[in-house]
Amino acid sequence: ISLLIGEEGNPLSSQEVLEGGESLILSEVAEPPAQMIDSLTTLFKTIKPVKRAFICSIKENEEAQPNLLIGIEADGDIEEIIQVAGSVATDTLPGDEPIDICQVKKGEKGISHFITEHIAPFYERRWGGFLRDFKQNRII
């Protein structure tokens, strides 16, 4: 609420950087919110730098209430993508539970590793027809 009435601007831009060594509990979401996923998929189709997007749940300890975490893999600076995705996610999520959004990079450790290696993306940019043939035939 303080972010809504404060002078800082956009309440969606609250950022918290976790120090290395802090542990988080990540898990797959059994039934992701369909309307939010559909809206984010539609959005990401219009933003070329977005390669893939994932959703999982995150909590700080066993007793904590889990939050949804949206991981976005994209080329370049993704601050603006995170802002737009946050707006769409909060507008389409039933209820008003918090949503976390982070950038994921293939090959990085920590949250990025868990998400890219253990969670199936709900959005993946389509390959061009020529490249799609290569991917399907395992040529690349």
What residues fall within each predicted segment?
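A cross-taxonomic marker for long C-terminal extensions/tails that follow the last structured domain
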Residues: R126-I140
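A contiguous, surface-oriented mixed alpha/beta subdomain in the mid-to-C-terminal portion of proteins
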Residues: S2-I119, Y123
